[in-house]
């Protein structure tokens, strides 16, 4: 896979709580230089990134209900709509993991569906299921709920929990949602080999803060 092809599959990510404006500017400049699919940033920087990337092919991606997923549906939906209004074209939302593990599947599905419907096609919705907190059965259920709710992607991890993406989880998720939804692998992907492993397992998108190292095969 050549550099350009791989770059188009990467969300160049900076979600650290201490991320400052200068770092966001640098992230956007790097995304333009390398041709990454998007920058994935915290909501407060969405409009700044939109202004920096306007007119390019690089999308603005942000996170909702992040990183716990425990906010109410109303709060998540408000966050998402506000982000889209400020220039985001991709939303990575976290499911309510506790409700999923409690067996409250209807709530989890409705949580996603409400957000998808409110956005009304103005942005891609990627649903973070936080694989490290789920058993395989729960992972499959979460993926199928995301599919029923009208999401566009399922995503492995926030990168803020015990562990991130594994190729086994990516393959499991791909089998659960393909061909309707795509899979984003995120969390702990730091090398070219890591990225290719995830892509070979079924990932169409990679979330990484080590994007440039990955592209340069460092």
UniProtKB/Swiss-Prot annotation:
GO cellular component terms listed in the entry, alphabetical order: cytoplasm
Keyword hit for Metal-binding: no
Annotated pathway: Carbohydrate degradation; 2-deoxy-D-ribose 1-phosphate degradation; D-glyceraldehyde 3-phosphate and acetaldehyde from 2-deoxy-alpha-D-ribose 1-phosphate: step 2/2
Protein name: Deoxyribose-phosphate aldolase
Role this protein plays: Catalyzes a reversible aldol reaction between acetaldehyde and D-glyceraldehyde 3-phosphate to generate 2-deoxy-D-ribose 5-phosphate.
EC number: 4.1.2.4
Record GO terms (molecular function): deoxyribose-phosphate aldolase activity
Root EC class: lyase
Keywords: Cytoplasm, Lyase, Schiff base
Active site: 92, 155, 184
Main location: cytoplasm
Superkingdom, natural source: Bacteria
Places the protein is found: Cytoplasm
Pfam family of the protein (one): DeoC
GO biological process, one term: carbohydrate catabolic process
Entry's family note: Belongs to the DeoC/FbaB aldolase family. DeoC type 1 subfamily.
Catalytically driven reaction(s): 2-deoxy-D-ribose 5-phosphate = D-glyceraldehyde 3-phosphate + acetaldehyde
Natural source organism: Clostridium kluyveri (strain ATCC 8527 / DSM 555 / NBRC 12016 / NCIMB 10680 / K1)
Family annotation (InterPro entries): Aldolase_TIM (IPR013785), DeoC (IPR011343), DeoC/FbaB/LacD_aldolase (IPR002915), DeoC_typeI (IPR028581)
């Amino acid at each position: 896979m050549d550099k350009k092809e791989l770059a188009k599959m990467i969300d160049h990510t900076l979600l650290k709580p201490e991320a400052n404006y200068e770092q966001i500017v640098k992230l956007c400049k790097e995304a333009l230089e390398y041709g990454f699919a998007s920058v994935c940033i915290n909501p407060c920087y969405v409009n700044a990134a939109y202004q920096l990337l306007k007119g390019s092919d690089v999308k603005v991606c942000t996170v909702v209900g992040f990183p716990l997923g425990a906010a109410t549906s109303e709060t998540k939906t408000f966050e998402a709509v506000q982000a889209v209004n400020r220039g985001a074209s991709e939303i990575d939302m976290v499911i309510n993991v506790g409700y999923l593990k409690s067996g409250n599947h209807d709530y989890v599905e409705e949580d996603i569906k409400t957000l998808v419907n409110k956005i009304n096609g103005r942005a891609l919705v990627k649903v973070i299921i936080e694989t490290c907190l789920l058993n395989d059965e729960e992972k499959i259920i979460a993926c199928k709920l995301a599919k029923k709710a009208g999401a566009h992607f399922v995503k492995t991890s926030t990168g803020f929990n015990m562990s991130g993406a594994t190729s086994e989880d990516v393959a499991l998720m791909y089998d659960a949602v393909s061909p309707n939804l795509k899979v984003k692998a995120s969390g702990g992907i730091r090398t070219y080999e890591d990225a290719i492993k995830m892509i070979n397992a079924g990932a169409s998108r990679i979330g990484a803060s080590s994007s440039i190292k990955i592209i340069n095969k460092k």
